[in-house]
Swiss-Prot record:
Provenance organism: Microplitis demolitor bracovirus (isolate Webb) (MdBV)
Domain of life according to the entry: Viruses
Gene name per UniProt: A2
The protein, known as: Uncharacterized protein A2
Amino acid sequence: MTQPVLYKYSVIQFPGSFDSSVHNSYVCIPNSWIINRDEKKVIVAVPSNEEVPVSMSCILNNGPPSSHWKTYAGTLKYETGKSKILFTFFKCSYQLYKILIVIDSLQLTDPSNFIPQEMMSPTIQ
């Protein structure tokens, strides 16, 4: 019997209402921050602006979300448990932050299919 694959991180797309200035908002979060899922629809908890950047150890160790974080509905775009360094935007309550996240073996044939071009840039602003 095959065991289900357990992933550590997910790329979530939020609707434009998550931030009125961005039509398609993406975050890369630990799977432990997903509160509920139904196929590709998810409810995730994210920290407030004051708590960003979240401790890297919390992210890298797939730590649980805090009970006081707000929750948002989104669409699951990708999951991984393999290793590669990925520069990504971490979006919380109307602000963008770039953080370095180690993701286990991210194997993408063309990440631009679901990750906006500005997220692929190695430049940290």
